[in-house]
Structure formats: structure tokens, C-alpha cells
Amino acid sequence: MELTLWTYEGPPHVGAMRVASSMKEIHYVLHAPQGDTYADLLFTMIERRGKRPPVTYTTFQARDLGGDTAELVKRNISEAVERFKPKTLLIGESCTAELIQDQPGALAKGMGFNIPIVNLELPAYSKKENWGASETFYQIIRTLLNDKTNEINNINPQRWKSLGRRPKVNILGPTLLGFRCRDDVIEIQRILSEQGIDTNVVAPLGSSPDDIKRLIDADINICLYQEIAETSCEWLKRKCGMEFTTTIPIGIKNTINFINEVHDKLGLPLTNKEELEHKSKLPWYSKSIDSNYLTGKRVFIFGDGTHAIAAAKIAKDELGFEVVGLGTYSREMARQVRAAAKDLNIEALITNSYLEVEDAMKKASPELVLGTQMERHSAKRLGIPCSVISTPMHVQDVPARYSPQMGWEGANVIFDDWVHPLMMGLEEHLIDMFKHDFEFVDGHQSHLGHTATKGLDNIEDEHGLKNDTLKKNGGVLWTESGRAELTKVPFFVRGKVKSNTEKYALSKGLPEISDETLYDAKAYFS
């Protein structure tokens, strides 16, 4: 166990809560102390739902530990079933309750309820949130479908032809607190409908236990988020022979590949192949003269496995960026991320420490960071533009508007979210350059009525270029001419230029850095 200011994932019972809260007619009884009820806030504050999660906490206190906490568990289970009347009951423990070993799942199964009971054994001290969500979804499917899968062991993905109906698919993986899951589902359903494909069930998001029992009515499964749905898809393939897709439709090329994969598995002819690329504005921009400004931009990527891998492909193949860093906090996706990094000739960063990520980001000197809410904070400290592509996220990354990441519209959203920070970076650099010009009106009143501060002072303070901070670094002094020249360098690469110049001066034994030294260093590293 470690103490940290930030964490990428919560304990596995939070993942179970995500699945339970995403579904209908299901209830989760969580054996937990008072302090573990904080998870409710994730759904009401960040997801901004209009109702609380379907979770009952036993909320034992310190004084209860001297008595029979098992009776407390049984009482809460009984009250939850009587009050909420769920069609399926989930039973689990938080990390603290796991130490007491009351075995609430066994207690619930011995109480004689006439509903399916799913006992969630989630090892809190070795697994994390996404694994907990995946395991919960898998256990629900296995409990509700186990009898039916014994009857059906080989589902033909092309059986829709003989049945005289349109092909049907399940969309598996979207949950609450996932990154833009709600909008992704709408976009993928729209794409499938355009291709003549119906959606049978979307799960866990918006599904009920009765919907889970209908999963085997579909011809194939769409594994939309590997972290959540891959285990369930593999089990359905093993038990009933249901095929599932592996292409994640994020970006133009992956969306086209996804459509091709779905058509191939269903045996459905693809008639409008030539029209597909024109569904988004991203390909048009990539071919335009304006895109030359983006070519070769250095980008650092970190997030969950699904979004990090997809972002790397878009950055390299569709926008012409140079990927200088790729990593994930998801241990379950480490193998896939390492393979993607190897294709880019870089080493993957697999860690759940935001400090390690910030350090790697600093060393890579990117011009754009694509990451989580934590990378947004780190990038701000380093003066680098950033766009959030993955959970964990802030409330501002759960927009009320339609804003998917997948499909054609998702490609448009990604284009806006990634390109605009770079364009604004150029604008800020131009302001930086001219702010100390005598013709630039620097002392004007703002609309708030406060007097603006001097531009050069702002630049120097923001980027650490004042005498007291830049005066000495490893024995190297910055002269006035050197400082003045450094402020003309775009802020998003200024840190790298400063660091390289100081290394150059030290290697040459120079006692101070002037503008000429900076020019020499630039030529040396070019």
C-alpha cells in the first residue's frame, strides 16, 4: 500500500459500482465502513446523474467490530431486497471490509432469496477499478447465461441469412464513468444502422438482467472497450461460439477497419466502401496545406490501454505527429501497449505513478500531451498544451453536448481537441513575442478594470526566466542577451531549448550563456 496525492484507478469495488450503476433492475450490497461511501460522489458530481447509484452500504463503524458484523450484513441485505426488489443482487466487500472476512456473498446465498445472487470476490489489494468492472460484468453474464449457454454451443455469425432478418450485434463494454461512453454508443449504433445492422443489446450501460439473457440472440459481439468487455466476450465465444470484434473504431482508419471487420464476420457485403472516408473532416484537413504546421509535432500519450493505443495510431498515421512517449496505467493492457510502442520504436511506460509520468513527459519534451486529468495538471506545470483522451477525468470532460470519441463524429471531435491547443499555442507565442515591443499597448486597462502587468515580466515569470531563477544552473550564468533571446523561443519548446543550451555550455566549459551561445547550441543539436 502506498500514500499518494493522485490515483489513476480506484479499488475494484468502484469498478463493480460502475457496472451496477450502469444497469437497471440490479442492486449492489457493499460491505464497507462509513468512509467508503465516498464513491457516490463520483456519479453525482462527475457523471452528473440525476439519481444515486443502486448501492446499499453496510456502513459498519469501529464500535461494531467488537460485535457480530455478520448480522449487520444480513440485515442490510434483507432490507435492500425488500425495498428495491432487484431482479439480480450483487454482493461485495470494500478493501477495508475484506480484512474482516465476513464473507457476505455466502451469507446472502444462505438467506433463501428467489433471485440470482452474484458473489463478487474482488481482491482489493492486488487489483484495480477497471479489473473490478470487467470481473463484475463477466460474473453477471456468467450467472445469468450459464444455463442457456449449455443449450447453445455454436452460434453461426451468418445465421441471420437463413433466419430471414437483418444481422444483429451486441455492443459490450460501455459504462458510467467511462470516457464519452454514452456518446460513443450513439455514434456506433448510427454507423451500424447505416450499414443495415441492428443493435440487439448494449451492456452494461442501460441494460437489465433480462437484456443480459438476450445476448445470445445476437450474431456477433462488438467489444467496444477491451478493459471492460474482453473477458466476457472471450467467455461467450468459448461457451457459445459467438465471434467478437477486436478493432476499436477510434480514428478514421480504425473506423473503416472496424466496419470491414463487422461485415467480414457477418458475411455482409460492403457496398459503400468509397464513401466511408468522406464521413469526417479529419482526412480533408490532413491533406490540406494547413496541416503542414502539424507535421512532425512531438506528442506524448498516456491513458487507459484502449484510448492510448488508438491515440498513438491517429497521431502517427492520420495527423503526421511524432509519438515520443506512450504508456498506460492499466496493467491488464500492458502487453498491447508495449506492442504498440514497439511499432513506434519507443519504450512503453507502464506505471500508476503520476510522478513517473510527469518525469517521462519532461524528458520527452513534447509539444502536445494527450493524457488523463493528471497529465493535464502536469502539462500545465510544464507549459505544454494538453488534451484529455482517457479517464480519470474531470467534470469538464463529461460534456452535456454530443461529443463522442469513436466513429466519424468522434474523429471530428478528436481533430478539434488535439489541433486547437497547438494552434492556440502558436497564437500565445506570437503574443509572447510582441508583448515587449514598444508598439504593443502593454499597460492598457483590462475589461475587469485592473491594470495589466508588463509583458516581459509576465513572460519571464511564467517560464522561469527571471534573474533569481535563471541566474545559476550547474554553474552556468545567463546574460541579459541570452535571456532576451530565450524569450523569443516558442513557450511550448522553450524548456527543451533552455535545457539543451545549458548542457551545451557545460560541455564546452562556458561560464555564461549569451545569445551567441544559444545560436551555437541550436546549431550543435540540429
From Swiss-Prot:
Listed cofactors: [4Fe-4S] cluster
Superkingdom field: Bacteria
GO terms, biological process: light-independent chlorophyll biosynthetic process; photosynthesis, dark reaction
Residues annotated as catalytic: D290
Catalytic activity annotation: chlorophyllide a + oxidized 2[4Fe-4S]-[ferredoxin] + 2 ADP + 2 phosphate = protochlorophyllide a + reduced 2[4Fe-4S]-[ferredoxin] + 2 ATP + 2 H2O
Free-text remark on how the cofactor is bound: Binds 1 [4Fe-4S] cluster per heterodimer. The cluster is bound at the heterodimer interface by residues from both subunits.
Function field: Component of the dark-operative protochlorophyllide reductase (DPOR) that uses Mg-ATP and reduced ferredoxin to reduce ring D of protochlorophyllide (Pchlide) to form chlorophyllide a (Chlide). This reaction is light-independent. The NB-protein (ChlN-ChlB) is the catalytic component of the complex.
UniProt name for this protein: Light-independent protochlorophyllide reductase subunit B
Keyword check for tRNA-binding: no
Binding residues annotated for [4Fe-4S] cluster, in chain numbering: D36
MF terms in GO: 4 iron, 4 sulfur cluster binding; ATP binding; metal ion binding; oxidoreductase activity, acting on iron-sulfur proteins as donors; oxidoreductase activity, acting on the CH-CH group of donors, iron-sulfur protein as acceptor
Source organism (scientific name): Prochlorococcus marinus (strain MIT 9515)
Pfam family, one: PCP_red
